């Protein structure tokens, strides 16, 4: 998949967690809804996403690309495949994806994302430490999922956002979900 999708992954993170001035939880849903008519909102958000992507260091760009790489695994777990869409933007049926996620399945996917993130950071040379340090590659959240749930339950929301926003990121990049044959 292309960097356009990784750009939206980064934009979601910046809008939800990194930049307080951008703070808006459903930014990708809003962007998707304004996409079809190329409204001023969509154009502004797209430029903002591109600007934030251009400022991002290459290792963090790769972190976004790696997250995208896991999408096919998440989708297969739910019985979906990913394909190029004939429509622009691709149609999203929320009832097909997010609305039907049982709590146990969401928990499984969130846990998978957490372990994917831990592995990505560890392979890149990061180590667990009490304080985050980008120079020495240290991060306090490199820990097992069950420990994260106990010590930092608010952080689990980031992993859940990866799952909830997956269809929007794919649609904005011109991809769609389809039900795999049983």
Predicted regions and their residues:
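Alpha-helical propensity feature that highlights long, continuous alpha-helices across diverse contexts
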Residues: 1-182
């Amino acid at each position: 998949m292309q960097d356009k999708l990784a750009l939206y992954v980064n934009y979601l993170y910046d809008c939800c967690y990194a930049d307080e001035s951008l703070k808006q939880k459903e930014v990708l849903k809003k962007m998707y809804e304004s996409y079809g008519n190329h409204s001023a909102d969509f154009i502004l958000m797209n430029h903002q996403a591109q600007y934030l992507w251009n400022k991002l260091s290459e290792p963090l760009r790769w972190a976004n690309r790696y997250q995208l790489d896991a999408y096919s695994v998440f989708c297969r777990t739910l019985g979906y495949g990913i394909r190029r869409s004939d429509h622009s933007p691709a149609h999203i049926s929320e009832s097909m994806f997010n609305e039907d996620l049982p709590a146990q399945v969401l928990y499984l996917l969130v846990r998978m994302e957490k372990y994917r993130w831990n592995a990505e950071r560890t392979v890149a040379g990061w180590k667990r430490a009490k304080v985050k340090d980008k120079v020495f590659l240290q991060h306090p959240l490199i820990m097992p999922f069950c420990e994260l749930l106990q010590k930092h339950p608010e952080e689990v929301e980031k992993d859940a956002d990866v799952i909830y926003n997956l269809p929007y990121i794919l649609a904005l990049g011109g991809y769609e979900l389809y039900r795999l044959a049983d």
